[in-house]
Amino acid sequence: MKLQYLVALLSVQAVPPVTAGYIHQYALVGSAIRQPIDQKTQREDLNKLVSDSPLLSLHRTICEIESVSNREGAVGEVLLKYLRDRGFTVEKQIVPADRGTNSTAERFNIWAYPKGCPRPKIILTSHIDTVPPHIKYSLHAPDGDFDRAKVRIMGRGTVDAKASVAAQIIAALKHLKSNKDIPLGLLFVVSEEVGGSGMVHFSNSELNTNPPFFHTLIFGEPTDLTLVDGHKGNLRVTIEAKGVAAHSGYPWLGRSAISEILPILARMDELGDIPVETGGLPSSEKYGRTTVNIGTIKGGAADNVVPETASASIAVRLAAGTPEEAEEIIRRAVYDVSGGSTNITVNFPDSMPYPPIDLDVDVEGFDISTVNYGTDIPKLEIHDEELEVKVKRYLYGPGTIFVAHGAEEGITVGDLEKAVEGYSKLIDAAVKRGWPREVVVN
């Protein structure tokens, strides 16, 4: 045997399997060349990694079930059984289908608490619906040397917000295992992604007492494991224009609705960039500038017809002020551009617009951030006006909003596991703080 072949043979060493036997890899020492990993073996190892973890397996179970808004019933049933099997008393709170949908399937909020504790002091809450379309759950090993924490889990809802749901449940179970008397409740709602009717339903129900029986609410959304000290407000706007249809060869015989609406939309598009003094929307040091997104534009029937109608829908993320103040600024801007034309109509279709929402961040050990997206938080009316000590509201969760709703939605095992630690820290702080005095709930 030639010497160089002997040296090469002796230099081949198997890299020991890492992290409890997951992912078999082999390398040539001193070489960048790696033998290809058998795909079937890799898939089996990744699935075993998930199956061996209560957190990861719960997350996989609920992410594999499609739960687009208004079709949350199947994942709800799975969670009901999971929580009952682990000693929770679980209640269904039936929520009617949202307006404008054709769904007749039952769907519901989930209200769960330890036996004998129907009015828990600490509530962890998130949502079980997702945006469409459903994207199949999948596991992906990291490039290079295997690192368990870097295994990536992808699919719809893996971040927003089933990562929070799974982490909250596991954190609650761990605390109740160590102390069954901790007053923990779980609330998982539907339709967060399409207006928040699930949380509104809970807010209007007899479970939301006056004064509240709870002193802490921990909301779960993708926050990159930071504790959020607030998020922007939200206001929806629709603008409609009426014209007169005519043959495009004789446009002077009609009036273009699109031509009427375009300068108004141009003005709307800049309202967040100009000072209030010159007719713009307000900004703040904490949240930055108010942003305006013209989300949809519709109009016309064909390219050879002068358009009779045109419309646009707009989302405004408020950095300061109230929705009422923003509505007045928008009405004034539309009036100024249109000259008060009766062919233009402005509406604000959201029944519950809200200003910027400030949140609590008084628990040590977290990085602090603000976010631009909306949540269910303002949809839950808290009746603590007469209380000296107000209900605490925290917003925290695993994953980044930057991939939520997209084709590449995904989260690492490490971030998901860290979220359990984060929720546990928030629970510990709430238990330590306790309730300063007895409150009689009617």
From Swiss-Prot:
The keyword Zinc applies. Keywords: Glycoprotein, Hydrolase, Metal-binding, Protease, Secreted, Signal, Zinc. InterPro entries: Bact_exopeptidase_dim_dom, Peptidase_M20, Peptidase_M20_dimer, Peptidase_M20A. Glycans are attached at N102, N343. Its EC number is 3.4.17.-. Binds 2 Zn(2+) ions per subunit. The active site is at E192 (proton acceptor). Its cofactor is Zn(2+). Residues 1-20 form the signal peptide. The keyword Transmembrane helix does not apply. It is found in: Secreted. PANTHER family: ACETYLORNITHINE DEACETYLASE (PTHR43808), PEPTIDASE M20 DIMERISATION DOMAIN-CONTAINING PROTEIN (PTHR43808:SF8). Belongs to the peptidase M20A family. This is Probable carboxypeptidase PABG_01461.
